[in-house]
Amino acid sequence: MAYDYSASLNPQKALIWRIVHRDNIPWILDNGLHCGNSLVQAENWINIGNPELIGKRAGHPVPVGTGGTLHDYVPFYFTPFSPMLMNIHSGRGGIKRRPNEEIVILVSNLRNVAAHDVPFVFTDSHAYYNWTNYYTSLNSLDQIDWPILQARDFRRDPDDPAKFERYQAEALIWQHCPISLLDGIICYSEEVRLQLEQWLFQRNLTMSVHTRSGWYFS
């Protein structure tokens, strides 16, 4: 199937996306998103990533901006259609398989992050690899391979072996992403949407919540 998400995934909008377990949302609404090295951590946080890769990222240095390591930042992708989301659905890559209903997608906007003077960096490939380039200026957003993101195409290509890593370019927000910088939540089903809206209502918070089952893998 051919996709074209160029209207929403582009350097002008600079939307950034993070997937989390649905049951982490109440804590996130109360505390925002905290980096791996933060002293503020949820007691019952449900991790959905690859534990081995999470461990490796802890000591990986960030060579620009505020510096530190990858665990000093809250990571986002520039697409909601990540290989990680597919691996969670399929159970590949050392990741626990989970139904789509358990996963929600948070959306923010890197231009809004910058406007609020929250420190950030971003990369043109998966942040863990040594050949990845890091940037601190929004003027460098054109270094991201937007066409493959817009086409939702992360198939490995023997003629372009770095394509898979470029698809996983990251936006990294220093230490803490407050809830005020989140623009909305995407979920798989109407049942989950109603639950998310209830959690927002209980906290007198207003945020867009949309059901987009077609954004998930099946």
From Swiss-Prot:
The active site is at 57 (proton acceptor), 170. It comes from the Bacteria. The NAD(+)-binding element stabilizes the ADP-ribosylating turn-turn (ARTT) loop which confers substrate specificity; both domains contribute to ssDNA-binding. Residues 41-59 are annotated as: NAD(+)-binding element. Interacts with cognate antitoxin DarG (via C-terminus); this heterodimeric complex neutralizes the toxic effect of DarT by preventing ssDNA binding to DarT and consequently inactivating the toxin by direct protein-protein interactions. The keyword Glycosyltransferase applies. This is DNA ADP-ribosyl transferase. Toxic component of the hybrid type II/IV toxin-antitoxin (TA) system DarTG, which plays a crucial role in controlling bacterial growth and bacteriophage infection. ADP-ribosylates ssDNA in the sequence TTT/TCT. In case of phage infection, DarT toxin ADP-ribosylates DNA, which inhibits both viral DNA and RNA synthesis and leads to abortive infection. Its toxic effect is neutralized by cognate antitoxin DarG. May target ssDNA loops during DNA replication, probably modifies thymidine. GO terms for molecular function: DNA binding; glycosyltransferase activity; nucleotidyltransferase activity. It comes from Escherichia coli O127:H6 (strain E2348/69 / EPEC). Keywords: DNA-binding, Glycosyltransferase, Nucleotidyltransferase, Toxin-antitoxin system, Transferase. It is an enzyme of class 2 (transferase). Belongs to the DarT ADP-ribosyltransferase family. Disulfide bonds: none annotated. It catalyses: a thymidine in DNA + NAD(+) = an N-(ADP-alpha-D-ribosyl)-thymidine in DNA + nicotinamide + H(+). Residues 14-217 form the DarT domain. Residues 123-170 are annotated as: ADP-ribosylating turn-turn loop. InterPro entries: DarT. Its EC number is 2.4.2.-. NAD(+) binds at residues 18-20, 57.
